Amino acid sequence: MDPIPDVPISPDLLSRDPQVGEQYASDPLVYHGPVARQTLEELFGTVAVIAKGPGFGALPTLWIHGEEDALAPLQVTRPAIEQLRGDQFEELVYPGARHEVLNEINREEVLDEVARFLDSVAVPAAAASV
């Protein structure tokens, strides 16, 4: 693994919405120190385990990702996501979006897509109680 700089996460990497970064930077409950090497090693290790494991089969899965996510780049997460791909898998990669896709400038579009996906895979209440 390449050397990890001893710097905190830049709020600019989270979203194209400047308010998201400002809120992150001013939140006293957010850890603002550098990312620990062990955390990153565990993340990469988890991606590798998922990439070798079983998929989700028929479990409905929606993967949303920002095309410009520098914290979890597509090329790093792609092997695990491809392994999880199952019968009801849908992928939405948003051009220009960064790490916090649900807090992006097009958040309404993203939330609408999540709601649409949930509606498409939800079991009606009457069928669920049978």
Where are these regions (language model features)?
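Short beta-strand/loop motif that positions the catalytic acidic residue
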Residues: 57, 63-65, 69
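Catalytic active-site module of serine/aspartate enzymes centered on a nucleophile-bearing elbow/loop
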Residues: 88-130
